[in-house]
Amino acid sequence: MSVEEGMEVELKSEKMDLDDNIPDFVKETVERSGKNPMSLFSELYVHMTGNTPVFDFYNRNQPNGSMKFICVVILNGERIEGNVKSKKKEAKVSCSLKGLEVVLKHVSEYVVPAVKFEEKTTFFEMLREHTYAKFYELCKNNALIYGFEKVIASVFLKINGNLQIIALSTGNKGLRGDKIVNDGTALIDCHAEILARRGLLRFLYSEVLKFSTEPPNSIFTKGKNALVLKPGISFHLFINTAPCGVARIDKKLKPGTSDDLQNSSRLRFKIDKGMGTVLGGASEFEAPQTFDGIMMGERMRTMSCSDKLLRANVLGVQGAILSHFIDPIYYSSIAVAELNNADRLRKAVYSRAATFKPPAPFHVQDVEIGECQVEDTEQSTSAAARSTISSMNWNLADGNTEVVRTSDGMVHDKDMSGADITTPSRLCKKNMAELMITICTLTKTSVDYPISYEELKAGSQEYAAAKKSFITWLRQKDLGIWQRKPREFQMFTIN
């Protein structure tokens, strides 16, 4: 049994021990958070009061001479008492569950911490503050996303000095290999900065649609060959901790060694059911990944977030499909809070590819690197890097939150009868492609049906050529092998 499977079994076992009289919404909140009731209650308690909860225990002598316990905590002057239990830990769990019931019922009143926007706050600090303020605002309408913010990312739109958050996501895990599907409905990479970009895509799709119906109200205008951003518009990315890969691993390498020179710039990838990243230049990783191989137990490989951000600074954030209609769009700045080092981050997302010359209309974006705090503390890392079993996403176009189970990349909910239902995320390949087809229909753009997702991407020939050139260049510079997913992931038909 793997470590992750063992953790899941332990979590399920703990849920089975929950008190029967605890409301379902409390049990569901604990389950979705991936945390034990004591940890979750303590975090919410701190959010509400600014203090750590103090648990007191009282003995209850039984007629047979045995000892049982009751745990009590005070929340905003209210005494919260758990059920009588034979062990102190069980009593504390019971008290925490009762406390969660109180907290969640009052979440809309207490949940949003006071975020101070001071006049001297820097632009990048504003990104951080607005990100957390937005997240806690969303918690008011969906308490189940509490505790998801260990790794959080957001994208901001800046128009002539006015700043607006347009996408926000949390998460630091990905799809398990035994849960893969070939119909484009499952999210593969649920790391926060990756989902924030996909939320940005939803916004960009909505703006392209808006241009087709009311051009003056869209962020786009007509360019020479495609839509381009209007003057004064830029996009900015915030991440609360350094992206996995080069931006993070470089800190651990010894300066001046061959490892430092050779490995600190090389491509790295995430492996399913694993933590951290692996160098992508080894010969055993040259063979393409296969669908049946992953199904049979091979560990799926996904490029690190540092490498994906590097790609975005070369090919744009819009991806292949939107490139049918718009010119490349780049982040103007990337800001990181914990574990940030401006030199490391700059190397990760820009310097490694600075000498690459992509074909027009692409370029290597000299993105501005922002720092939201001075100290790079290890203590913050342990909290920020903790994996969660769920991820949330929000974007301005859709306007509501969505919770995704990272192990299968799907949205899990219950119908009116209480039965479990599973649906694709709005950020998945299939739903994004269907948005593209909607745009083609409204703009009367010819599409040869039936068409696969792979064919739709390949139709953006300039993007495909630039991507191929970039991947070839990376290998020629001995920076490693770009790991591609099996073709089956992109061969599904779009309706």
Swiss-Prot record:
It is found in: Nucleus; Cytoplasm. GO terms for biological process: adenosine to inosine editing; chemotaxis; determination of adult lifespan; mRNA processing; positive regulation of chemotaxis; RNA processing. Its main location: nucleus. The active site is at E193 (proton donor). Disulfide bonds: none annotated. Keywords: Chemotaxis, Cytoplasm, Hydrolase, Metal-binding, mRNA processing, Nucleus, RNA-binding, Zinc. Its EC number is 3.5.4.37. The keyword Zinc applies. InterPro entries: A_deamin, dsRBD_dom. Residues 167-492 form the A to I editase domain. Residues 36-105 form the DRBM domain. GO terms for cellular component: cytoplasm; nucleolus; nucleus. GO terms for molecular function: double-stranded RNA adenosine deaminase activity; double-stranded RNA binding; metal ion binding; tRNA-specific adenosine deaminase activity. It catalyses: adenosine in double-stranded RNA + H2O + H(+) = inosine in double-stranded RNA + NH4(+). The keyword Hydrolase applies. Zn(2+) binds at H191, C244, C305. Catalyzes the hydrolytic deamination of adenosine to inosine in double-stranded RNA (dsRNA) referred to as A-to-I RNA editing. Acts primarily on non-coding regions of protein-coding genes including introns and untranslated regions (UTR). Required for normal chemotaxis. Edits the 3' UTR of clec-41 which is required for normal clec-41 expression and for chemotaxis. Plays a role in determining lifespan. Not required for RNA interference. Likely to play a role in determining whether a dsRNA enters the RNAi pathway. Interacts with A-to-I RNA editing regulator adr-1. Interacts with adbp-1; the interaction facilitates adr-2 nuclear localization. Can prevent somatic transgenes from inducing gene silencing via the RNA interference (RNAi) pathway. This may occur due to A-to-I editing of transgene-derived dsRNA, preventing transgene RNAi. This is Double-stranded RNA-specific adenosine deaminase adr-2. The gene is adr-2.
